Amino acid sequence: LDLRRAPLQRNIMLRHKIAKVTRDYFDENGFIEIETPTLIKSTPEGARDYLVPSRVHKGSFFALPQSPQLYKQLLMLSGFDRYIQLARCYRDEDLRADRQPEFTQIDLEMSFVEKEDVFAVAEGYMKRLFKEILGVDIETPLPRLTYTEAMESYGSDKPDTRFDMKIKDISDIVENCGFGVFADTVKNGGTVRAVTAKNAAGVYTRKEIDKLTEEAKGIGAKGLAFIRWVEDEPNCSFAKFMTADEMKAIYERTGAEKGDVVLIVADRKKTVLSVLGALRLTVAKRLEIIPDKYNLLWITEFPFFEYNEETGNWDAMHHPFTKPLDECIQYLDSAPEKVFADAYDLVLNGIELSSGSIRITDPELQKHMFEALGLSDEEAYAKFGFLTDAFRFGAPPHGGMGIGLDRLTMLLCGCDNLRDVIAFPKVSNSSELMSGAPAEVDNAQLKELSISIDE
């Protein structure tokens, strides 16, 4: 009965139109649609695999693909220059409004390309799609931000740029101030940063700011300082510790004026950016200042490694076939923090729509990446040998991306949940209500597969 509802039927029809425009556009641009296997070998790609037991090979399992990554690279090595597939993908991870355990990915790969070539094809697709589906003109080339720029200004690697409210660094202003929380944070290598909500003082009373403080603490902040400029003299939680010149400098740096609210967090840089990035979105929604439009942009130059404070190691942030930027390769062993990936995300209104990269084609560099992931030569060959062997016969430079069809449809439909654009979606506990899947199976089937269930 749910499928009879007009809104859901409208969304499913729009999904069909998006799929048709997709196939038409890529066909016209020389792409070949090729299906890749859905019963594959389990390889580490981040999330848990869905496993399928083999009846013929006792004790062995297939995995359902998290992406067609390895196969599409093999296609490039085989001479298929442009590949496209509306691929079914599976990831055994917790559900969110924008995540399902099985999903459809517009998967593409191109040979003899650099990042700019991938961007040109993807931007042409977005321009065509938005025009045909929504009648909206998308200006290209799309804006770009590096990962560092996005984090510094918006506190997110998938920023919503439909509104301003950028993060400002005031560490240099407060490093010697009388307010110990600020001064000590800077002295100990942390940072103090702020966002300004214009004309928000009437909405954000002290009680409302207390709610923001609790939200900030829930994300990891120790507290939240603020300036609430209602009368001629701003109400400030720390003004008595500051000089007039220091307060003036903060107003100038943050652009604060009468009627504004300034939110300030002091902590480690990673925590500060994460907290202010989240508060920025909360406040913008509360003030209803986010315009109803579509802002697409590229995020580029992601860090290749992330420092793990628990283990003291540098962990790889991407799948092992992502190529480092050429100028960074020299730092792979000596300075991991200086290594950036030739990777890119396409972001729409604060939601990651697509992710991709230029791939490694040098066998020695590929070996180095496996080592960085903690894989021995034997482990790497056991998992990926069929691809690395192919590299030795010569590999064209290639790259590509995957665009989430479900997520794209959700955004173009104006929905907030993927379930609203999928005919038979999974619910929050990863079950499918229509058929009752997953379900127990007959003991005879389990015995045939040599599987026993621990109670």
Descriptions of predicted regions:
Residues 1-455:
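Class II aminoacyl-tRNA synthetase catalytic cores and aaRS-like
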